[in-house]
Structures are given as C-alpha cells and as structure tokens.
Amino acid sequence: PTRRSSDLALAKPSSFPVGQVDFLRILPLTFREMLVAEDEKNLIAYLDAKVDLDPIPDAFFNPLVENLKKYFLIGGMPEAMARWVNEKHSGQIDGILWSIIQAYERDFAKHPEPREYPKLMHIWHSLPSQLARENKKFLYQLVKQGARAREYEDALHWLVSAEVVTKVPRCTKPALPLSAYEDLSAFKVYAADVALLRRLAQLDISSFLHPTQLCTEFKGAFVENYILQALTVAFPVPLR
C-alpha cells in the first residue's frame, strides 16, 4: 500500500526512490472544462478571446451566468461531472458529492495520530461558517469553542497537505517576492471544490436554484471559493 503525502508530512523521514517517481497533481475539473464537456463552443471561443475588462454582452453574459450556477451545483469532481454530462439529471449529484465527503472523512481516520481525528473533523466542518462570515482570516474559535492555534495546527497541516483544503496566507505588503511578506498569523482556508463546500454546508440543489433570503448571503462564500479554485489552476504556485 502507498502512503498519502499528508501522512508523510507528519511522519518520520524515510528512504525515498529519488528519480524513480513522477508526481502528477490532479485538480477538480474547471468551469472551462465543464463548458468543453457541454460542447459550449461559442462560449469557450468568447472566453478564450477576451483579454479586456469591458462589460460582457448579454448574448454571452446570460448563458455564462447560467452555466456558472450549474458549475456551483455540480462542481469539478469527475464522477459528479460525468453523471451530469451523460444523463443531464441533477437528482443523483448530491448523493455522489455526499459519498465523496464521507470517503474523505473515513480517510481522515487514517491519520498517523488518532487523537488528531476529531480536530480534522472540526476544521473540515467549520469551512462553511468560516467562509460565510465577514472574516479577514481563519478563526479558530469557529472550529471549536476555546480552540487555540497550537492545538489545531497539525490537523490543519494534514488537510492542506492532502489538498482537501487550500490555505492562503495574507501578505503584509504587495511586494516581491510575496513569500517574504507572509503574515503567518493570518490566513484563510477554502474547500478544494465549490460543490463539496455546498454539500458540506448541507445546501441541496433546490435551495440553491430557488434561494430565499436565508441562504442568499452564503452565495458570497461560493463565489470566493470558486475564484480561489480557478486561481489554483491558473497559477502553479502557492497562492497568497
């Protein structure tokens, strides 16, 4: 059996076959890849050709918005996307996404230190509340009352190493290199996939398609997480 990079990050160093292993990073499918799967050739051509910030004509804006809403519902996880593309039926999407979340949580139990499992779950399930609030940074008190950074930093590191979540540190000034100006005490944490965030928040498809005032404000969290997801693909460097 193989070990996850997240396990290795918290385990003791061991031998490694240098030069004999190729690493392949696989991320959720992007919005553009969904348009390709849906054969939206006109929309793809427009996006590929657009290089300015001028307003988008309604002929493209409206279908792009509708497709983006669809992407928020389906996300980029391959099984969910394949089911939608092949069957055009949203009824089974939430079940697929929930199964992925349950698989993640079972994988959390394989953490080298069993005592870290509850902490992994607390951080994981705090994502919706972290992103729904007007927070400038990740708040440990939203993970668990009385939680402190030093108690949860190993668990958070595991989730980041496993690429289940993405951690984005704040920079103290916009200067290069950005890594030299990281504020280690201030960062935000995002889900790897926007639709997994929706299911983690227990928002079903009908609630999203027909929103009430109760869930309208949470759409900002979806947009923020989607932008992070898109930037992660566009820039093959740690985001800040």
Task: Report each predicted region and the residues it spans.
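Interdomain motor-coupling "hinge/lid" segment immediately C-terminal to the ATP-binding subdomain
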Residues: 4, 10-132
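Conserved protein kinase catalytic core
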Residues: 9-10, 199
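Accessory nucleic acid-recognition modules appended to NTPase machines
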Residues: 82-240
